[in-house]
């Protein structure tokens, strides 16, 4: 089955965040060129419809992503074994292959050179960052085993962990945390993985990050903490998770130390 859009459509472009609190970008609007986009914003706005954790069959960043991209479906999303003719796949870059989860072609590219696994694109995104952003867990697992560096930051300090958290890909978040990445890494927007997980209303991802020690006091450049965002956006389940975590921390501090 042939791709319905040119390969270039898979290349994402940076979107400038809203500069004023009262006028954030609306993730539901269409771009000027007519393609659907999602735009990062750590400013509270009208809550989006409550979504469950991302389905394993869907691999595109959720609202709150730091990326602007077309919503081209990959072969895995369509449920097809092949999404393009071999000649078309051969024309894709290593970053596009990682984003689409085209493992066979990705492996062929990596065999061509030792330095390709951490090769950045024009925005500093590595294949691992792309795969993490699109929820391609098998690709993420393969790249980590191949030697991909999960600590690399893109030009605007975007990280694989932050983008995986943005999409609510809890399993990928877990894989990255096993590699001792900075759980509180911040990007150009002052956003941390926890802030992006809250912004996307990803309950399980928030739970996983808190369980691993994510900092609840960190503020984005907008001035909002994770709890502030949850309250402002009306994300009650996320708010409850944060409150329960705070209660556990408080209770643990009240437990007297064991006598020697």
From Swiss-Prot:
GO terms for molecular function: DNA binding; histone deacetylase binding. Gene3D superfamilies: Ankyrin repeat-containing domain. Keywords: Activator, ANK repeat, Cytoplasm, Disease variant, DNA-binding, Nucleus, Repeat, SCID, Transcription, Transcription regulation. One of its GO terms (cellular component) is cytosol. It is found in: Cytoplasm; Nucleus. Changing residue 121 to V: Loss of expression. Phosphorylated by RAF1. Ubiquitous. SUPFAM superfamilies: Ankyrin repeat. The keyword DNA-binding applies. GO terms for biological process: positive regulation of MHC class II biosynthetic process; positive regulation of transcription by RNA polymerase II; Ras protein signal transduction. The keyword Transmembrane helix does not apply. Residues 57-77 have a biased composition (Polar residues). Its main location: cytoplasm. Residues 22-33 have a biased composition (Acidic residues). InterPro entries: Ankyrin_rpt, Ankyrin_rpt-contain_sf, DNA-bd_RFXANK. PANTHER family: ANKYRIN REPEAT FAMILY A, DNA-BINDING PROTEIN RFXANK. Interacts with RAF1 via its C-terminal ankyrin repeat domain. The same domain also mediates its homodimerization. The third ankyrin repeat is required for association with the two other RFX subunits; RFX5 and RFXAP. The three central ANK repeats mediate binding to the PxLPxI/L motif of RFX5. Forms homodimers. The RFX heterotetrameric complex consists of 2 molecules of RFX5 and one each of RFXAP and RFX-B/RFXANK; with each subunit representing a separate complementation group. Interacts (via ankyrin repeats) with RFX5 (via PxLPxI/L motif); the interaction is direct. RFX forms cooperative DNA binding complexes with X2BP and CBF/NF-Y. RFX associates with CIITA to form an active transcriptional complex. Interacts with RAF1. Interacts (via ankyrin repeats) with RFX7 (via PxLPxI/L motif). This is DNA-binding protein RFXANK. The gene is RFXANK.
């Amino acid at each position: 089955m042939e791709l319905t859009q040119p390969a270039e459509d898979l290349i994402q472009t940076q979107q400038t965040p809203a500069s004023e609190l009262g006028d954030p970008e609306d993730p539901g609007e269409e771009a000027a060129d007519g393609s659907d986009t999602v735009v990062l914003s750590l400013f509270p706005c009208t809550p989006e419809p409550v979504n469950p954790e991302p389905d394993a069959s869907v691999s595109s960043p959720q609202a709150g992503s730091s990326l602007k991209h077309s919503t081209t479906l990959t072969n895995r999303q369509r449920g097809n074994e092949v999404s393009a003719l071999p000649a078309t796949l051969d024309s894709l870059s290593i970053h596009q292959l990682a984003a689409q989860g085209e493992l066979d072609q990705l492996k062929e590219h990596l065999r061509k050179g030792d330095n390709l696994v951490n090769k950045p694109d024009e925005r500093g995104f590595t294949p691992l960052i792309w795969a993490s952003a699109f929820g391609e867990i098998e690709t993420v697992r393969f790249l980590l085993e191949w030697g991909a560096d999960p600590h690399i930051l893109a030009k605007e300090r975007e990280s694989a962990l932050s983008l995986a958290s943005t999409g609510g890909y809890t399993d990928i978040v877990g894989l990255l945390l096993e590699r001792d990445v900075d759980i509180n890494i911040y990007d150009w927007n002052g956003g941390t993985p926890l802030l992006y997980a809250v912004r996307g209303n990803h309950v399980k991802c928030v739970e996983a990050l808190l369980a691993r020690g994510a900092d609840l006091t960190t503020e984005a450049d907008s001035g909002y903490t994770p709890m502030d965002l949850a309250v402002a956006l009306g994300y009650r389940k996320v708010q409850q998770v944060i409150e329960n975590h705070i209660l556990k921390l408080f209770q643990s501090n009240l437990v007297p130390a064991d006598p020697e």
